[in-house]
Amino acid sequence: MPSSPLRVAVVCSSNQNRSMEAHNILSKRGFSVRSFGTGTHVKLPGPAPDKPNVYDFKTTYDQMYNDLLRKDKELYTQNGILHMLDRNKRIKPRPERFQNCKDVFDLILTCEERVYDQVVEDLNSREQETCQPVHVINVDIQDNHEEATLGAFLICELCQCIQHTEDMENEIDELLQEFEEKSGRTFLHTVCFY
């Protein structure tokens, strides 16, 4: 097992549902974890599919919560958005954009292929300084509360297995293959360098 804990990042589009659910579970299990979004704005469901609530990444979860409470308490209570924001504000103050973070991670988990592509593109556009590898793995998770919870447990199990490998670089492909067979999901995986 590695002597130092894995530095993990979980990334979805708006740093609201999927990445925050995984952040919550991983931090409770003792992982060094941060979560991010890759979008240009934070989008939350609105009164209609074509009317999302759009916020800047600088907006706190508390401000979003109060804004939606004011707009339509019943709707946002019923669809679970207020509950989700309440959880989020207990984890960290506001959503963060992956592209603005210069921290180094051992493992970056993304929640959909488009986000995976954006993370890989961002990492590859940075100037390589240390040549330290970072494994980027995509676990497709539908953006709803139930799937976010199931996906978070899968991500957590995956991180625990990777944490317990003797040699992550040589064992990760085999480990991912086992996870694909067990979960019935396919994972994208690549290595980038810092």
Swiss-Prot record:
InterPro entries: RNA_pol_II_suA
Protein name: RNA polymerase II subunit A C-terminal domain phosphatase SSU72
Principal localisation: nucleus
Free-text function comment from the UniProt entry: May be involved in the C-terminal domain of RNA polymerase II dephosphorylation, RNA processing and termination.
E.C. code: 3.1.3.16
Cellular compartments annotated: Nucleus; Cytoplasm
Gene Ontology CC annotation, any one: mRNA cleavage and polyadenylation specificity factor complex
Biological process per Gene Ontology, one example term: mRNA processing
Originating organism: Gallus gallus
Entry's family note: Belongs to the SSU72 phosphatase family.
Classification lineage: Eukaryota, Metazoa, Chordata, Craniata, Vertebrata
One Gene Ontology molecular-function label: RNA polymerase II CTD heptapeptide repeat phosphatase activity
Catalytic activity, reaction form: O-phospho-L-seryl-[protein] + H2O = L-seryl-[protein] + phosphate; O-phospho-L-threonyl-[protein] + H2O = L-threonyl-[protein] + phosphate
Keywords: Coiled coil, Cytoplasm, Hydrolase, mRNA processing, Nucleus, Protein phosphatase
EC supergroup of this enzyme: hydrolase
Any coiled-coil regions, as ranges: 160-186
